[in-house]
């Protein structure tokens, strides 16, 4: 960062053109990890520092050539087996995961499959992999996560073809171009969004947008842990402008995953 006292005036960047100096009246940190803010000296927390963890990363992928009719029949036949909370079905295809685990074909610390039909009836999105202990502010950790994420994609895809009706002839169409990061730095701002703000559906006067996503917190108590906390008062909550304004530094704003929020509140607004 290029600083003039407590004001950020630009930065030194490395790009395909080489090392460049870019001056800016205002810089908006959209790095996801709050890289600019952290290097400028703004205080932050990395994940849930009380528990010394971050939410696990994931490697999303998409499959095609699925017989949707057979898959829907499988789900319909087990509709009474779903674990339900607040009217929402959880743990899709967990009966097949249990079968595969018993036969030694499932090594992941997951108990179910996140599977969602795409626009085309035969294309389905899979959100199941879970890579624990990844620090997205560390390049070596990111590399390890990429390798493990793609290994898990291979295992999950093999499982789908072998155990899930309708997926016998499925094809792996694509996977994420990079690791999906749920949590890293939470930059300290003039205001901080809390889980209570979300539950109570608070909309401060300086809200810059409103959200309706409930808190979806992964892996806080181990790789099989999932917490889902819904809004109890109203249908939405606001993100105050103060959450985008970092402490101590002028000329800098935050956007995206890194803005000022507690770890559990970030489980909602990260989406």
Q: What is each residue range found by the language model?
A:
Residues 5-10, 14-26, 30-268:
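Flavin (FAD/FMN)-binding glycine-rich loop and adjacent Rossmann-like elements that form
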């Amino acid at each position: 960062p290029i600083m003039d006292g407590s004001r950020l005036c630009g930065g030194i960047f490395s790009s395909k053109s080489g090392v460049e100096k870019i001056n800016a009246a205002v810089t908006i940190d959209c790095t996801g990890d709050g890289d600019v803010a952290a290097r400028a000296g703004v205080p932050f927390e990395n994940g849930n520092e009380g528990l010394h963890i971050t939410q696990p990363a994931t490697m999303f992928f998409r499959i095609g050539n699925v017989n949707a009719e057979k898959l829907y029949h499988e789900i319909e036949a087990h509709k009474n087996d779903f674990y339900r909370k607040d009217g929402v079905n959880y743990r899709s295809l967990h009966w097949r995961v249990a079968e595969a685990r018993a036969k030694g074909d499932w090594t992941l610390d997951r108990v179910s499959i996140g599977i969602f039909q795409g626009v085309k009836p035969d294309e389905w999105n899979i959100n199941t992999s879970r890579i624990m202990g990844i620090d997205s502010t560390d390049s070596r950790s990111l590399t390890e996560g990429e390798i493990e994420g793609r290994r898990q994609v291979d295992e999950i895809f093999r499982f789908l073809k072998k155990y899930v009706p309708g997926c016998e002839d499925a094809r792996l169409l694509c996977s994420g171009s990079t690791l999906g990061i749920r949590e890293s730095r939470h930059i300290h701002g003039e205001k901080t969004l809390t889980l209570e703000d979300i539950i109570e559906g608070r909309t401060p006067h300086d809200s810059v947008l409103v959200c309706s996503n409930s808190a979806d917190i992964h892996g806080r108590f181990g790789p099989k842990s999932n917490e889902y906390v819904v809004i109890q008062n109203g249908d939405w909550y606001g993100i105050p402008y103060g959450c985008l304004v970092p402490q101590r530094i002028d000329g800098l704003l935050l956007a995206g995953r890194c803005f000022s929020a507690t770890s559990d509140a970030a489980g909602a607004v990260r989406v």
